[in-house]
Amino acid sequence: MSLEAIQFDRSHRDDISVRVLDQLLLPYTTKYVPIYTIDDGYTVINTMQVRGAPAIAIVGALAVLMEIQLLQNDGFARTQTFYDISSFELTRSALSQRLDFLLSSRPTAVNLSNALREIRVLLAQSAGLAAFGNGVYDFVCRLIDEDLTNNVKMGDNGAAFLLDALQQEGFDEDFAVLTICNTGSLATSGYGTALGVVRSLWNDSLAKSQAPGDGSAKKRKLNQGRAKMVQVYPLETRPYNQGARLTAYELVHDQIPATLIPDSSIAYRIATSPVPIKAAFVGADRIVRNGDTANKIGTYQLALVCKHFGIKFFVTAPKTTIDSKTETGAGIVVEERKPNEFKHVSGTLIDSQTGLPCVDNQDKPVSASVGVAPSEIDVWNPAFDITPHELIDGIVTEDGVFTKSASGSFDLTNLFA
């Protein structure tokens, strides 16, 4: 069974439905939240019920599509104070304001901005609501389908690049990799970005371990070297614990050998790992022209530690994450989250005697929030940090892996189209 962050039922074009997995309840509770309006999309994005730059863009675009579907019901439109449907020009103006509102849900993630920019173009070009709805529908379907295809390409590109580099170094042993936050099926339409590379590395390891004559499904080797990834170290990724709650959940689901580690243990884990750690693969919420990258808080320090130990550090993201208008990381607006998201820890209540989740009278796991810091203490809680391009060894995309020139700079112009 594949993991799904987004359920988009398009079997009936005139009656589509969207549900989003509430990732705040994982790993013990699986609950899908229906999306009917832009307000619903804003809420699940802003509260981080859905996260991951590609998934955020998809959910945002789907929320617009769902609101259009409701707008075409005259009764619904007349109940909304922000719409005047007496003319499409007035509706167009209101929709433009609604897109502004939706964009404010997570301003750092460039994928959402890019998707809404495409929708604005469609809005400007459409002669009426029906034409606009058809255009958005086609765009959303293409966005989802291309994301999944590109994720598999990225996974294989990043895995093959690392394996080839290790072969050129003469390294032919088992190895481990690091990752942070969640960049897998739960952050995308499927397979993942950085975690997609991990999936491809694991498939390669299975292929190299497959005995001749094995009757099981044949796996595909990504290169002819003997190096195999045998261990993944996901960081817990405080304060939202996406690594612990989500990435660990995906790795267990896919039966990929993994050991969850504290954010503060990176250096010591590298120094003491029973198998050598040869690379770190991370995702991105925004990559600017020079290669500086905004990603989950903690990515910068992971890159610094990798630099110290000589470990390859790769950013993995689709071309839609490239911001061709911003020159350097200094131009990225970093979102800051509410203090209580740092001072409180939320999760499923566990019975101290049995170690099992506590359940309510409907046999559903009970969620709880506990304080871990004085309520009076000041808090700085940035959602992202900026990793300088100098610390990045390669940027993995669906078009291949981009590395730095002899001068130490990235040339990403081929990705700006």
From Swiss-Prot:
Disulfide bonds: none annotated. GO terms for molecular function: S-methyl-5-thioribose-1-phosphate isomerase activity. It is an enzyme of class 5 (isomerase). SUPFAM superfamilies: NagB/RpiA/CoA transferase-like. It is found in: Cytoplasm; Nucleus. Its main location: cytoplasm. Pathway: Amino-acid biosynthesis; L-methionine biosynthesis via salvage pathway; L-methionine from S-methyl-5-thio-alpha-D-ribose 1-phosphate: step 1/6. Keywords: Amino-acid biosynthesis, Cytoplasm, Isomerase, Methionine biosynthesis, Nucleus. One of its GO terms (biological process) is L-methionine salvage from methylthioadenosine. InterPro entries: IF-2B-related, IF-M1Pi, IF_2B-like_C, Initiation_fac_2B_a/b/d, M1Pi_N, NagB/RpiA_transferase-like. Its EC number is 5.3.1.23. It catalyses: 5-(methylsulfanyl)-alpha-D-ribose 1-phosphate = 5-(methylsulfanyl)-D-ribulose 1-phosphate. It comes from the Eukaryota. Gene3D superfamilies: translation initiation factor eif-2b, domain 1, Translation initiation factor eif-2b, domain 2. The record marks C181 as: Transition state stabilizer. Pfam families: IF-2B. One of its GO terms (cellular component) is nucleus. The keyword tRNA processing does not apply. The active site is at D285. Belongs to the eIF-2B alpha/beta/delta subunits family. MtnA subfamily. Catalyzes the interconversion of methylthioribose-1-phosphate (MTR-1-P) into methylthioribulose-1-phosphate (MTRu-1-P). This is Methylthioribose-1-phosphate isomerase.
